[in-house]
């Protein structure tokens, strides 16, 4: 072992010992105990104290090529959520608003994510978690707030994905036996169980590998089937109604909710965690992955969203495959592909929580497939997904969850925080014009976030009064 390796081992040992509780005497003479986590570099907090940023992780980092990360991002963009964008984006906004909104949302999302990617190595080190980056720039309070926002974001995305998987299973059942015996909550419970089985076997994000290829195949299958069958239905049904439904007040709230859905469509809320897996040079490679996502990777989203709205107009179902007509076996293949792709996509969005649980509470010994590590995943990840599944079954309002996710977390994480962090770090190198531009983004998206949250809560309240807990929708 050379001197460099010895130094690294000594640093790891120092980090391990620093995680033990430390004691000190307070002003009143009583002993105060403070637990210092496994951390490695320091940052200033609000009181000019020091807070440390973690580099310790139970998952693999810095090993993936840019195109694998590009496929991870594309998998998120083209998840089964795309089957709902005709209804959740185009119906409330119409042709002009929906088309311009999708293009504009893609542009501003690409810009905001590029800003975030350029902050990955602030301070001469990699920040492998969003909360670590926020903590390094702002301090301990923002570290905790960012983690809370991100947790809400990913929890609601995963809840929506489990609802989608349940809808796909129910759609398959209805194709063969439309007797009302198998309810949506049962399908959601079964979907959560399958997602848990997948989570037990895939230890970390980088281990997806071949599954990303399969995810792409599944996405292309259900998108192509939905596209072709919608095209056929649109040709055979020339009379279509594109009128934006609802009263004047309803349209205001649904329009705001649709704006939240626009930003939800393109953003993960976990870019630093995804960037952590990429090989150096991390900024350059991440830019390649982002360009892939927002060009080639977004084409399927546009195709199925526009075609679904063109074919069915304002009567488009919130799950497009419920609107299409055609042979049972083709619709079965499409729904099964949507179900399987959703299982893989959920693992991507759940990976930051898995990483936190594995790093914080895992044994840290043995390989990822050692019996004790597998049993740990069964207990911890199984418990997390059980809560996700319960919420999904209780409130299966998919479009509302998309709006609320965009409002509460996608806007703050991707647009407000990214612009303000970039402004804070680079302000000495910026012109007055650029500073004003970033402040405009911060204030504007903050206002949109509040408005979208109000609209989403109203939509959920309306749906809750119309339906009931564990509704069979």
From Swiss-Prot:
| Annotated keywords | Amino-acid transport, Cell membrane, Membrane, Transmembrane, Transmembrane helix, Transport
GO cellular component terms, semicolon-separated: membrane; plasma membrane
According to the UniProt entry, where is the signal peptide? none
- Enumerate the transmembrane spans: 65-85, 88-108, 145-165, 188-208, 210-230, 252-272, 290-310, 333-353, 378-398, 401-421, 437-457
Q: InterPro entries of this UniProt entry?
A: AA_transpt_TM (IPR013057)
State if Cell membrane is listed as a keyword. yes
What is the tissue localization of expression for this protein? Expressed in roots, leaf blades and sheaths, stems and young panicle.
Q: Tell me where in or outside the cell this protein is found.
A: Cell membrane
Looking at the record, which segments are called Disordered?
1-31
Q: Is this entry keyworded Transport?
A: yes
Q: What's this protein's family per the entry? A: Belongs to the amino acid/polyamine transporter 2 family. Amino acid/auxin permease (AAAP) (TC 2.A.18.3) subfamily.
Protein task: Proline transporter that mediates proline transport across the plasma membrane when expressed in a heterologous system (Xenopus oocytes).
Protein name according to UniProt: Proline transporter 1
Q: What is the lineage of its organism?
A: Eukaryota, Viridiplantae, Streptophyta, Embryophyta, Tracheophyta
């Amino acid at each position: 072992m050379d001197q460099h390796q010895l130094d690294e081992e000594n640093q790891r040992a120092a980090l391990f010992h620093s995680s033990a509780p430390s004691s000190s005497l307070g002003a009143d003479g009583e002993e105060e105990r403070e637990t210092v986590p496994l951390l490695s570099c320091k940052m200033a907090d609000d009181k000019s104290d020091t807070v440390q940023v973690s580099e310790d992780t139970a998952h693999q980092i810095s090993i993936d090529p840019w195109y694998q990360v590009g496929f991870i991002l594309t998998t998120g963009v083209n998840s089964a959520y795309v089957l709902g964008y005709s209804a959740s984006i185009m119906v409330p906004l119409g042709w002009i608003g929906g088309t311009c909104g999708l293009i504009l949302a893609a542009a501003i999302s690409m810009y905001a994510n590029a800003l975030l990617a350029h902050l990955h190595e602030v301070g001469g080190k990699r920040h492998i978690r969003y909360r670590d980056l926020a903590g390094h720039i702002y301090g301990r309070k923002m570290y905790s707030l960012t983690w809370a926002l991100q947790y809400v974001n990913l929890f609601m995305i995963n809840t929506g994905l489990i609802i989608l998987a349940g809808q796909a299973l129910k759609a398959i059942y209805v194709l063969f036996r439309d007797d009302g015996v198998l309810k949506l909550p049962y399908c959601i419970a079964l979907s959560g169980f399958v997602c848990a089985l997948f989570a037990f076997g895939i230890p970390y994000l980088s281990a997806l590998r071949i599954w990303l290829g399969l995810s792409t195949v599944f996405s292309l299958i259900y998108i192509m089937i939905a596209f072709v069958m919608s095209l056929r239905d649109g040709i055979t049904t020339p009379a279509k109604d594109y009128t934006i439904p609802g009263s004047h007040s309803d349209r205001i709230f649904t329009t705001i909710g649709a704006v939240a859905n626009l930003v939800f469509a393109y953003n993960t809320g976990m870019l630093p965690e995804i960037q952590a897996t990429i090989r150096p040079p991390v900024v350059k490679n991440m830019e390649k992955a982002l360009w892939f996502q927002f060009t080639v990777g977004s084409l399927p989203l546009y195709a199925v969203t526009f075609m679904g709205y063109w074919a069915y107009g304002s009567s488009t179902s919130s799950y497009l495959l419920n609107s299409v007509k055609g042979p049972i076996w083709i619709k079965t293949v499409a729904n099964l592909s949507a179900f399987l792709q959703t299982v893989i996509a959920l693992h991507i969005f759940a990976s930051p929580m898995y990483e936190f649980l594995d790093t914080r509470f895992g044994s840290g010994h043995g390989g990822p497939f050692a019996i004790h590590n597998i049993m740990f995943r069964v207990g911890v990840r199984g418990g997390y997904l059980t809560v996700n599944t319960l919420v999904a079954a209780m409130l299966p309002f998919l479009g509302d969850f998309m709006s609320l996710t965009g409002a509460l977390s996608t806007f703050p994480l991707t647009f407000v925080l990214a612009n303000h962090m970039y402004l804070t770090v680079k302000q000495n190198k910026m012109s007055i014009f650029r500073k004003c531009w970033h402040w405009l983004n911060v204030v504007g998206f903050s206002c949109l976030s509040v408005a979208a949250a109000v609209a989403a809560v109203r939509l959920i309240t309306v749906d809750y009064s119309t339906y009931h807990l564990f509704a069979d929708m």
